[in-house]
Amino acid sequence: MLRNKIDKIRLLFRKDRESYSCFYRILGFYPRNIRLYEQALLHKSTAVRSEKGRPLNNERLEFLGDAILDAIVGDIVYQHFEGKREGFLTNTRSKIVQRETLNKLAVEIGLDKLIKYSTRSSSHNSYMYGNAFEAFIGAIYLDRGYECCKQFMERRIIEPYIDLDKLSRKEVNFKSKLIEWSQKNKMEVSFELIEQSLDKENNPVFQTEVRIEGILGGSGTGYSKKESQQNAAQMTLKKIKGDPEFMASVQEAKTQNNVPAEDTTPESEMSLTAENQQIDEIISTEEISV
């Protein structure tokens, strides 16, 4: 409390006091290193570079914030739901840290109005707000530490915007979300039951794999086929979001799967050239939203 009063007095003499006040309204405290928060809201499409020529955006902070957010929300959920099993806690945490929820939270606290991005670029997607939220968490962690970060989530996010008990009862269909994503991006998705066994108490256990364009996305187990599919779909969605190498492999496989068989006749060669040009155009302009 005293620290905030001191920061407020110092703020009167700063040229950038408007930015500090803006972040204070969101955070409930004044930043010590405001540059961290500004970078957290800097989308890669702006193509801003540091004095050393390195790209300056929020991707590294997003990476850090993703890990910190998982830990903090796991901590909060663990304390709130005393005695609940690991599977329940994992699912509840997933509902909070999923991209759609983070998008909404970013809008609720006003981050969407502060994000800087290039309107000329089509590289940003519908998850830009959620990504910025994660980067913002990373900035808080570096600026103030874990405990302050946890207090921000509890007092400024969970209490005003999330009913944990109600959320825990809400069922999220990860399989439907994955299928919806695949249809939007014209990707072939398959669910394969690869193993069925019994646990120590002779309960049936199922294991399912998800493949996108033939590339393994995720594997999940469960006490029913539906549960194993849901877990596999959830893992695949996380991989789509956070594994660029996986998505590059999927795109390459999709391109190869769409290449037509060769024909040596002059007419077919001309047709094949035209088709390849069309495919190249589609690939070059297609955006995968994850």
From Swiss-Prot:
Pfam families: dsrm, Ribonucleas_3_3. Residues 267-279 have a biased composition (Polar residues). The keyword Lyase does not apply. GO terms for cellular component: cytoplasm. Residues 254-290 are annotated as: Disordered. Mg(2+) binds at residues 62, 131, 134. InterPro entries: dsRBD_dom, RNase_III, RNase_III_dom, RNase_III_sf. Digests double-stranded RNA. Involved in the processing of primary rRNA transcript to yield the immediate precursors to the large and small rRNAs (23S and 16S). Processes some mRNAs, and tRNAs when they are encoded in the rRNA operon. Processes pre-crRNA and tracrRNA of type II CRISPR loci if present in the organism. Belongs to the ribonuclease III family. This is Ribonuclease 3. The lineage of its organism: Bacteria, Pseudomonadati, Bacteroidota, Bacteroidia, Bacteroidales.
